[in-house]
């Protein structure tokens, strides 16, 4: 029998072709712009805006990235001197005072601080690590026109008056294996341009502005911590930190302190970011930190963290250079920095002022936690977390009540077909009923949701087992596999269900299920908002709001149906006539009809015999419907159909509007794509290459599977109307991408595997071991390719969550033979032990280095570094003692004097010997000259094109000598 359908001439009808085309077009119309926004950086303007010079900025970036410039390198000193020169050039190039007068301003006072005096000893919280660091920071202070003219910082007891200023920070050191273009060269040149901008007439700041070029960020955020010891650090109450956790692309707002300090970022021409990234940082999904934690956590400032985030494969490698970034990326960070800083320095309120604090931190006040996100990289939304909480609670209460009231109204109007299997004619005593089949479709949703989602989760485990790093280079192959599998299975399951039990209520029941599921998620999100201050679930509110409206429309749609009693009466009329003519309004096809015995003319029933049908009481009328027990009316699937009825759905569905589904789809799918789509892309970019850092690979695949469900779950109410074309195409896509994801090599020249290098030398014996850490077995394969490993036994052990493969390396030449003929002369130390107390004094120096450390076999109780400053905001000893003391100096060949104290009973409990024991280690990090670290040169030369090299620790070469007292 032919399967009738609604008129194909209606372009908005709920029929296969309109549903397929409209849903596909809407998804493409939103997904494509999201991808473009995520991957394409807005072009820099053809001419520089007033107060900026992009040509200068690009030239500065090229000069800055001329070589590796970690703190412990001679190139770092060159960068320091170059920065001072450039800063003075920019200040000298400021217009004369007369030009400021023409716009009603005064030329601002500018003070440059070259801090070569500050130092600090501090500890890593709970890590058993102590650090002594000497500053080479550069600070530029542009006095605000609202500030007084006193030079308060020259008074040892001086304090800034008036409202707090603004700090903009970038670090000018790089890692020893990266040129530092985006980490943090773009931030540095942005700060240079801010000097130019805020010394231009018309841009003089209201509040004081401090531009900090800090040195030593890469080695435990040392530069930001020692900045706290300079008097100018008392001025700023707010800050903007410019960073790079990737290598190019867009600069994203990673995190911020509160809603008030975030609002100036709304001025950015191309805002980018989501509060969910801040929650991800707090959860430790990204295994790195920025100076933000020092300024906010240790100093008490309120501010923002803007950073590049991808690709992490280039982060801290030689591909973090000017060639792999662009002027567009420079402009994206610079424009955001200008807009945000201008908003902060022009603020006339007292919102960033607070009561004095007893802990010594800045009295910057406190603001409400914020919720923030961008919309297509063009607009930025900021509101307070308690607003989100209030909206969430309101919607949690109002939405169910609205549906409940609507359901009651439907019931009173006798139009509540949902959950109704039958209805009685109006004048019936209840013994005669007409089938409605209103329950059909209610139990489909769990299968529609669980089966596709379970398969995608299974795919996540499958890929993790056989090719866990494929997402490193082929993230969209993984996405394509997940999406194609999910959509095809959802379509297949829905088509099977629709074929077996067709229902006009598939849409309303699926939306009702979605409403219930999302209501539960909104409850969870609201609890986390209230209890833990987590705002990352903001998207649930908007998605739930759209689903609620779509569900409500489905309920309102039922008012278009006839009253159930009228409908049943109209169907029952033929059974009460002797005529063979009858109504077919109630015929619902797809039901099998069993013939029963005819009634006698007087309505009596023939006496039952052994030949009587077992279905006695079920009677076929002249109208071809059937009475079951109690005159239950049924239909015959051979009956002629209503012309506007779709398929074998219930006959009463012809009264339902045919276009409403479009409105429902537009209320659900676009909201999901707009709010969840950017989060999916952000999470993929931020985490897809973290497996090489030791993070669990399974997490990102599970996240992709879960996000696939979130992104495509709006299709479930409509997908049973899909034609077979797109699902079958997706089945082919799934087959191809599954094979590719299981067998393809996971790395490429554009997405290299990052390996971590270190060479450790025993200066007493001359024995050295070069090591590479990284993903196994690839790290072993790379080590085996090196000429120096031929014939050697490469040993691989687990270290710092990563396999570490070591071999006897080519001896380093970090100290020239003319300076020291023997390796043991590279490092000198002297230890003097107290005769009466468990104390000792160590004097340590290294040749051609300004970084050493002392590693103890057992934690010491206390230590003091000669001439060091101490600050109660930065405890210098961990609660469980100190096992390692890192020593940094601004001078080459410096001698550190360290006094240590250990437990009084240590001599009695030490099985290794009396007193104190451990290693003195010096670090060499300058890899700019070939032949200085030949083992590293060999790795760079012979490693495959799909592998890159980064540093494992602060030093590329670590030379050690043992001590015992």
Swiss-Prot record:
Vacuolar side: 38-387, 463-472, 529-532, 683-698, 747-965
Residue stretches spanning the membrane: 17-37, 388-408, 442-462, 473-493, 508-528, 533-553, 662-682, 699-719, 726-746
Disulphide-bonded residues: none
Record localization: Vacuole membrane
GO biological process: proteolysis
Pfam families: Peptidase_M28, PFF1_C, PFF1_TM
Residues where Zn(2+) 2 binds: 183, 218, 316
CDD domains on file: M28_Fxna_like
EC identifiers of the protein: 3.4.-.-
Residues of the site described as Transition state stabilizer: 315
InterPro entries linked: Fxna-like_M28_dom, M28_fam, Peptidase_M28, PFF1_C, PFF1_TM
Co-factor note (free text): Binds 2 Zn(2+) ions per subunit.
Top-level taxon of origin: Eukaryota
Protein name: Vacuolar membrane protease
Organism: Aspergillus fumigatus (strain ATCC MYA-4609 / CBS 101355 / FGSC A1100 / Af293) (Neosartorya fumigata)
């Amino acid at each position: 029998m032919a399967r009738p359908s609604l008129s194909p001439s209606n372009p908005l009808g709920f029929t296969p072709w309109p549903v397929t085309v409209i849903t596909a077009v809407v998804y493409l119309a939103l997904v494509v712009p999201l991808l473009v926004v995520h991957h394409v950086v807005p072009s820099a303007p053809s001419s520089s805006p007033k107060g900026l010079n992009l040509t200068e900025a690009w030239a500065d970036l090229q000069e800055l990235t001329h070589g590796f410039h970690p703190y412990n390198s001679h190139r770092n000193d060159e960068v320091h001197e170059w920065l001072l020169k450039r800063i003075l050039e920019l200040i000298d190039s400021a217009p004369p005072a007369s030009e400021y007068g023409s716009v009603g301003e005064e030329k601002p006072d500018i003070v440059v601080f070259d801090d070569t005096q500050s130092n600090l000893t501090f500890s890593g919280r709970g890590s058993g690590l102590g650090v002594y660091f000497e500053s080479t920071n550069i600070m530029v202070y542009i006095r605000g026109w609202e500030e007084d003219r006193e030079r308060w910082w020259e008074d040892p007891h001086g304090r800034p008056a008036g409202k707090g200023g603004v700090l903009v920070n970038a670090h000018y050191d790089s890692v020893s294996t990266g040129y530092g273009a985006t980490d943090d060269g773009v931030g540095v040149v942005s700060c240079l341009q801010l000097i130019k901008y805020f010394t231009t007439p018309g841009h003089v700041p209201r509040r004081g502005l401090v531009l900090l070029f800090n040195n030593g960020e890469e080695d435990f955020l040392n530069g930001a911590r020692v900045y706290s010891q300079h008097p100018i650090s008392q001025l700023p109450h707010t800050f903007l930190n410019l960073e790079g956790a990737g290598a190019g692309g867009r600069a994203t707002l990673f995190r911020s302190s509160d809603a008030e300090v975030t609002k100036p970022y709304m001025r950015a021409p191309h805002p980018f970011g989501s509060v969910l990234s801040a929650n991800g940082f707090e959860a430790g999904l990204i295994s790195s930190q920025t100076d933000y934690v020092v300024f906010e956590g240790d100093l008490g400032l309120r501010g923002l963290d803007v950073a590049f985030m991808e690709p992490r494969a280039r982060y801290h490698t030689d591909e973090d250079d000017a060639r792999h970034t662009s002027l567009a990326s420079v402009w994206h960070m610079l424009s955001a920095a200008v807009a945000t800083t201008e908003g902060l320095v022009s603020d006339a309120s007292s919102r960033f002022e607070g009561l004095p604090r007893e802990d010594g931190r800045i009295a910057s006040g406190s603001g409400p936690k914020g919720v923030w996100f961008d919309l297509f990289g063009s607009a930025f939304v900021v509101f307070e977390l308690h607003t989100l909480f209030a909206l969430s609670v309101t919607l949690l209460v109002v939405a169910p009540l609205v549906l409940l009231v609507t359901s009651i109204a439907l019931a009173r109007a006798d139009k509540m077909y949902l959950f109704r299997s039958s209805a009685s004619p109006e004048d019936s005593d209840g013994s005669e009923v007409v089938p409605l089949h209103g329950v059909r479709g209610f139990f489909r949703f769990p299968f529609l949701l669980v089966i596709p989602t379970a398969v995608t989760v299974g795919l996540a485990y499958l890929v993790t087992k056989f090719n866990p790093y494929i997402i490193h280079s082929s993230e969209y192959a993984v996405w394509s596999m997940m999406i194609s599998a999910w959509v095809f299975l959802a379509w297949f399951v829905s088509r099977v269900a629709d074929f077996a039990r067709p229902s006009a209520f598939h849409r309303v029941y699926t939306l009702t299920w979605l409403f219930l599921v999302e209501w539960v998620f909104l409850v969870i999100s609201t609890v986390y908002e209230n209890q833990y201050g987590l705002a990352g679930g903001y998207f649930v509110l908007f998605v739930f709001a759209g689903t609620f409206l779509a569900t409500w429309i489905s309920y309102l749609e039922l008012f278009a149906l006839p009253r159930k009693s009228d409908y049943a009466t109209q169907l029952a009329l033929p059974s009460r006539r002797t005529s063979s003519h009858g109504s077919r309004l109630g015929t619902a096809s797809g039901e099998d009809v069993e013939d029963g015995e005819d009634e006698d003319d007087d309505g009596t029933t023939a006496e039952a015999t052994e030949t009587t049908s077992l279905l006695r009481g079920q009677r076929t009328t002249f109208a071809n419907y059937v009475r079951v027990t109690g005159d239950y009316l049924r239909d015959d699937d051979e009956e002629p159909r209503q012309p506007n009825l779709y398929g074998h759905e219930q006959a009463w569905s012809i009264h339902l509007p045919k276009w409403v589904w479009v409105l429902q789809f537009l209320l659900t799918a676009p909201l999901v794509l707009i709010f969840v789509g950017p989060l999916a892309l952000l999470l993929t970019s931020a985490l897809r290459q973290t497996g090489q850092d030791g993070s669990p690979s399974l997490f990102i695949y599970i996240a992709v599977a879960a996000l696939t469900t979130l992104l495509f779950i709006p299709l479930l109410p409509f997908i049973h109307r899909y034609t077979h074309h797109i699902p079958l195409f997706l089945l082919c896509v799934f087959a191809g991408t599954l094979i590719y994801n299981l067998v393809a090599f996971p790395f490429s020249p554009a997405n290299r595997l990052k390996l971590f290098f270190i060479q450790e030398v025993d200066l007493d014996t001359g024995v050295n071991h070069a090591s590479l850490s990284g993903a196994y077995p690839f790290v072993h394969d790379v080590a085996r390719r090196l000429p120096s490993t031929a014939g050697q036994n490469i040993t691989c052990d687990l270290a710092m969550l990563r396999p570490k493969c070591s071999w006897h390396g080519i001896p380093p030449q970090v100290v020239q033979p003319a300076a020291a003929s023997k390796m043991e002369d590279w490092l000198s130390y002297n230890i003097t032990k107290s005769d009466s107390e468990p104390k000792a004094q160590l004097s340590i120096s290294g040749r051609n280095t300004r970084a050493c450390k002392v590693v103890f076999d057992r934690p010491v109780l206390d230590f003091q570094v000669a001439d060091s400053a101490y600050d109660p905001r930065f405890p210098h000893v961990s609660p469980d003692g100190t096992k390692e003391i890192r020593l940094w100096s601004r001078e080459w060949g410096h001698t550190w004097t360290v006094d240590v104290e250990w437990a009084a009973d240590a001599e009695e409990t030490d099985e290794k010997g009396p007193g104190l024991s451990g290693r003195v280690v010096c670090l060499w990090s300058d890899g700019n000259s070939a032949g200085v670290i030949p083992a590293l040169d060999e790795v760079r030369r012979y490693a495959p094109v799909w592998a890159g090299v980064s540093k494992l620790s602060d030093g590329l070469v670590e030379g050690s000598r043992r001590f015992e007292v």
